[in-house]
Amino acid sequence: MEGKEEDVRVGANKFPERQPIGTSAQSDKDYKEPPPAPFFEPGELSSWSFWRAGIAEFIATFLFLYITVLTVMGVKRSPNMCASVGIQGIAWAFGGMIFALVYCTAGISGGHINPAVTFGLFLARKLSLTRALYYIVMQCLGAICGAGVVKGFQPKQYQALGGGANTVAHGYTKGSGLGAEIIGTFVLVYTVFSATDAKRNARDSHVPILAPLPIGFAVFLVHLATIPITGTGINPARSLGAAIIYNKDHSWDDHWVFWVGPFIGAALAALYHVVVIRAIPFKSRS
């Protein structure tokens, strides 16, 4: 409807899951599964909301890298863990920023801020390939710029403290790092699917408002578990931005882990949600 602002559910495609603000909750009996997003939707390219969504993803990922990389550097700068926020503080910074940024951007872009989340939602047919590729490019550019601003403000400290780049820690194999990234991303993307499930949103009108909270908390918990192993990637844009700006050989040695792991984890989460939790393939046959 012209002139009426629409409420975009977190992770939603522009077309099928948008509902006017104030839409009443539906019962299970009345609920109808939203149609899958078209695989390729060139019509989106002529819509301002499409370009605005990408800009929102860029700004959100920019802010995410800026705050989190500064937090990581602050912890590494401290002479001992007791003099800084420590691993718990890093985890809170990552989880808290995701909570805040998903809340801010959910109604504009769906609040992905992570190529793995975008990839998982694309596999579940929640958004088109056009939008998925656009989001991933903007997320990566935002991450590079966010890390670049940190280096611009503190060039010597940035290089000396590792620039927040992800690497597999000494004592762990690449396989261990890959496994940590797969499971960590599975937890995140599974939480995204559960928190933004269209059927749950239709039944319980308060769920979309609360969605940023479990998503941010999932990021917090995964960081607590995997910072000692990989520094916690679970977000290829975050890993890419820090690696490009830091640009040391060892930051690229394991970089593939932080793309392959999150994409596998996201794919498994999408498969689990669609096939097991929602059983959509079986419903279509009946």
Curated annotation (Swiss-Prot):
Task: Enumerate the subcellular locations listed in this protein's record, separating them with semicolons.
Answer: Cell membrane
Which InterPro entries does UniProt cross-reference here?
A: Aquaporin-like, Aquaporin_transptr, MIP, MIP_CS
Q: Could you tell me which residues carry Phosphoserine?
A: S284
Query: Which is an annotated GO molecular function term of this record?
Result: water channel activity
Q: What are the start and end residues of every segment in region (Disordered)? A: 1-34
- TM spans (from-to): 55-75, 92-112, 133-153, 175-195, 209-229, 257-277
Tell me the membrane topology, using the record's own terms.
Answer: Multi-pass membrane protein
* Extracellular topological domain residue ranges: 76-91, 154-174, 230-256
Question: Any ranges marked Cytoplasmic in the topology annotation, and which?
Answer: 1-54, 113-132, 196-208, 278-286
Motif NPA 1 covers 114-116
GO CC, any one term? plasmodesma
Q: What keywords are assigned to this protein?
A: Acetylation, Cell membrane, Membrane, Phosphoprotein, Repeat, Transmembrane, Transmembrane helix, Transport
What CDD domains does this protein's entry cite? MIP (cd00333)
The UniProt entry, under Pfam families, shows:
MIP (PF00230)
Residues where N-acetylmethionine occurs?
M1
Q: Per the Swiss-Prot or TrEMBL record, what residue ranges does the short sequence motif NPA 2 cover?
A: 235-237
Gene Ontology biological-process annotations: response to water deprivation; water transport
Identify the SUPFAM superfamilies for this entry: Aquaporin-like
The entry's note on the tissues where this protein occurs is: Widely expressed. Expressed in roots, above ground and in flower buds.
UniProt family annotation: Belongs to the MIP/aquaporin (TC 1.A.8) family. PIP (TC 1.A.8.11) subfamily.
Q: What is known of its domains?
A: Aquaporins contain two tandem repeats each containing three membrane-spanning domains and a pore-forming loop with the signature motif Asn-Pro-Ala (NPA).
| Functional description taken from the UniProt entry | Water channel required to facilitate the transport of water across cell membrane. Its function is impaired by Hg(2+).
Please name the PANTHER family in this protein's record. AQUAPORIN OR AQUAGLYCEROPORIN RELATED (PTHR45687)
- From the Swiss-Prot or TrEMBL record, give the protein name: Aquaporin PIP1-1
Species per Swiss-Prot/TrEMBL record: Arabidopsis thaliana
Encoding gene, per UniProt annotation: PIP1-1
